[in-house]
Swiss-Prot record:
Belongs to the QueA family. Signal peptide: none annotated. InterPro entries: QueA (IPR003699), QueA_dom1 (IPR042118), QueA_dom2 (IPR042119), QueA_sf (IPR036100). Keywords: Cytoplasm, Queuosine biosynthesis, S-adenosyl-L-methionine, Transferase. Pfam families: Queuosine_synth. This is S-adenosylmethionine:tRNA ribosyltransferase-isomerase. The keyword Transcription does not apply. GO terms for cellular component: cytoplasm. The keyword Iron does not apply.
Length: 355
């Protein structure tokens, strides 16, 4: 069994990308080919992605849109608070994290952004239910701030409001971006279309739990956060057509991967084929997992000891990912949300931990 320490590495802090590059496709792309030993690592630019995939392949994108989910405000007593919307649960209700000197009780009124009041409802650990006086999405968009990841050290500005969204984001509901998609611009998508690469979308609303650290050495004891996803019938049909013509299903980002594999695992366990699905998932993919749908993965470089590093290690192989990350650090790749990307291929032979 792998432990948390197996997924640790030393990352020079200056390699954590603090801002987006001027052009989305200006990022670098590390293509990882583990069909040879040792794995072949090819340094590319992201704009070269079309040369790495084939006509008839299917790219699966997550079309979630990041909410302006961060608010600063105060209690009736004048005490300062910070609120992060975790998810919208109804037209006028949402779940949120609240930072305050003392947790507010049910019935408490909070003033947000000096613009409107919300009422605290029941506690749904670790979140609070908030009741909004007008439709949540309207007030969030008008008065909230974009919630950048904790390792980005500046407050969101006008540039972030554009660059921390994918160009195809259309379904508001996330509190973090599906960052592998940030590298795609419209000209690149048009090039992929022209060469016969298929595209499809699903929705997974990324929650704040994506930044939750793993606090147990035995990773089997870690409990994943839950996120809502929607896998439409049009995507199911495109996956079937891709399989029929011998193409690859390529997930753009770990969120697309998690939604696809969650739906496929549920179908497998029920003894039925993949079908359109709307559900919650807390799928936790670690080495030894049997992948059912995804053949290749476009992804960014992830945090040490993170569940996403475990996911890519399960997909491409622990030793392959270790070698790729060593190479990326040596070659000064940019890491995390605004960083560079990798193109991985599924390893079909599970690895055992080293003695």
């Amino acid at each position: 069994m792998f432990t948390l320490s197996d997924f640790d590495f030393n990352l020079p802090p200056e390699l954590i990308a603090q801002t987006a590059l001027p052009e989305r496709t200006a990022s670098r792309l590390l293509e990882v080919d583990h069909t040879v030993e040792p794995a072949r690592l090819v340094d590319r630019n992201f704009v070269e992605l079309p040369s790495c995939i084939a006509p008839g392949d299917l790219l699966v994108f997550n079309d979630t849109r990041v909410l302006k989910a961060r608010f600063f405000g105060q209690k009736a007593s004048g005490g300062k608070i910070e609120v992060l919307i975790e998810r919208v649960t109804g037209t006028h209700t949402a779940l949120a994290q609240i930072r305050a000197s003392k947790s507010p009780g049910a019935g408490t009124t909070l003033r947000l952004a000096d613009a409107f009041d919300v009422t605290v409802g029941e506690r749904v650990e670790p979140f609070f239910t908030l009741h909004f006086p007008q439709p949540c999405l309207t007030l969030i968009e008008q008065h909230g701030r974009l919630p950048l990841p904790p390792y980005i050290e500046h407050d969101a500005d006008a540039s972030d409001e554009t660059r921390y969204q994918t160009v195809y984001a259309s379904n508001p509901g996330a509190v973090a971006a599906p960052t592998a998609g940030l590298h795609f611009d419209l000209p690149l998508l048009e090039r992929l279309d022209a060469m016969g690469v298929e595209r499809a979308t699903l929705t997974l609303h990324v929650g704040a739990g994506t930044f939750q650290p793993v606090r147990v050495e035995n990773i089997a004891e870690h409990r994943m956060h839950s996120e809502w996803y929607d896998l439409p019938q049009s995507l199911v049909d495109k996956i079937a057509a891709t399989r029929a013509r011998g193409g690859n299903v390529i997930a753009v980002g770990t969120t697309s991967m998690r939604a696809l594999e969650a739906a496929a695992r549920s179908a497998d366990e029920a003894g039925r084929p993949l079908a359109a699905t709307q559900a919650e998932t807390d799928i936790f993919i670690t080495p030894g997992y049997r992948f059912r749908v995804v053949d290749r993965l476009v992804t960014n470089f992830h945090l040490p000891k993170s569940t996403l590093l475990m996911l890519v290690s399960a997909f491409a192989g622990v030793e392959t990912i270790r070698a790729a990350y060593r190479h990326a650090i040596d070659q000064r790749y940019r890491f995390f949300s605004y960083g560079d990307a990798m193109l991985l291929t599924r390893r079909d032979t599970p690895e055992a931990p080293r003695a």
